[in-house]
Amino acid sequence: MRIVVIVGGILCGASLALAGPADDCNQVRDLGRQLRGCTAYIDKGMGAPENLATAHLNRANIYAQRGRQDLALGDYAAAMALDPRNPLAPYNRGNLHFDAKRYDLAIADYSRAVELDGEFALAFLNRGLAHEWLGDTVAAAKDYGQALAIDPTSKAAQKRLERLNSQ
């Protein structure tokens, strides 16, 4: 069980012409509407790079939920190119790789996320899970410990670390 972060980012500074698609892209109640809004916002190509990155990230998450990994990977790559300092893009791409059992690729993406945000407890936790699936319990325990150091209330990290320490 890995932990997922869903982005509902705010696209700031959108012009009035883009307000409709931006609003649709940011709402999360109707995924079809969100997908159409993000696509329209991206197709206009007029937003600030970090806003376009958020639109790609939101759309990628929808594609991932719908099982369209190919499209999700493309949007995660676009988000990372547009806003290379946003840790959510590699984190969510890592989740996609994890779900596809591509644990080495997941670890690389989670590692990038923690390079960008050293306080990203969920990235440490999920990287620990990927290490554990690959049989590297030492690295997994280290990541679970780091996740707990950042978020002492993380029951998932605590449970995993206790289980590893009892073996």
Give residue ranges: language-model regions.
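Conserved structural position within tetratricopeptide repeats
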Residues: 40-47, 77-81, 112-115, 148-149
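Terminal, low-structured helical/coil segments at or just beyond the last alpha-helical repeat
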Residues: 24, 141-167
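N-terminal leader/linker segments that initiate helical-solenoid repeat arrays
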Residues: 12, 16-47, 53
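Conserved alpha-helical positions within TPR/SEL1-like repeat arrays
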Residues: 26-27, 54-64, 88-98, 122-129, ...
